[in-house]
Amino acid sequence: MFNSNVKDVTSKEAYSLIKDDKEFVILDVRSKEEYDSGHIAGAKLVPVQVLGSMIDDLDKYKDKKVLVYCESGKRSPIAIDTLVDNDFTNIYHLSRGIASWKYDVTK
C-alpha cells in the first residue's frame, strides 16, 4: 500500500515505539471534535483537510519519526501521501486508527 518510507503498525507496536522514543512526532489527522473526544498523549492535531496548507509548519519534523493516525485508518493514508510527497522519510501508520488503540487517551 505504501512505499518503503512508511510502515504499518498495530496499536501495540505504536505504543511501544512512542513509549521508547520521546522524539516521536504524533499526528492526529481527524477533526477537532474527534481530537477533543480523545487522542494519543502528545499528538498534534493536523486535520487531513488542512494538512497540505500546514506542510511548511511541519517541515521541521521531516527527519523525525512520525506516527500518523485517524479514526479507523481510512483518512490517514491521504495524509501520509502528502507527507511522502513532501519528502518525509520515516512514517509510521497506525493501520486501524485510534479505534484500535487499547491504551489511555488524553481529552
Language model features by range: what are they?
Residues M1-F24, K32-K65, E71-K107:
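Rhodanese-like catalytic fold shared by cysteine-dependent sulfurtransferases
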